[in-house]
């Protein structure tokens, strides 16, 4: 690969798994972090409630598992509340995933929500959290 960097993009999101999104958001909003508009959405294996606060180029995403056996519900059960993922924005997720696959990095989960393609990478054993790649729709 030479000098070409893997994931040569900026961090655009920190994802935090929580038991009670409304309670967590209310506390953070008292500290000046927020507001967290919320939605409920399907993810592979179930359903979650998501609240996102945008500050400049960075999003803070609160994720509350609601139904099913999802990567988020398993994380909450096994590790408790806390940082789940750090997301890098990329322009071509398929190209980046191919680079990472050549390095032996496995994909834990992937999908598309509201036009955003995303993939969780199996990095938790190495750094304590999951790295995510996200490709936003153009425009």
Regions found by a protein language model. Give the residues of each.
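Regulatory and interaction patches adjacent to catalytic/ligand-binding sites
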Residues: 75
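Long, hydrophobic N-terminal alpha-helical segment
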Residues: 2-46, 55
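Short loop/beta submotifs within extracellular cysteine-rich repeat domains
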Residues: 24, 35-36, 70-71, 128-129
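Short, structured motif recognition centered on aromatic/hydrophobic residues
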Residues: 11-18, 28, 53, 60-63, ...
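Vicinal oxygen chelate
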Residues: 2-5, 18-25, 30-32, 51-54, 60-61, 67, 78-139, ...
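Short amphipathic beta-strand starts and helix->beta connectors
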Residues: 2, 67-72
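Short, charged/polar surface micro-motifs in flexible loops or helix N-caps
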Residues: 56-60, 67-69, 93
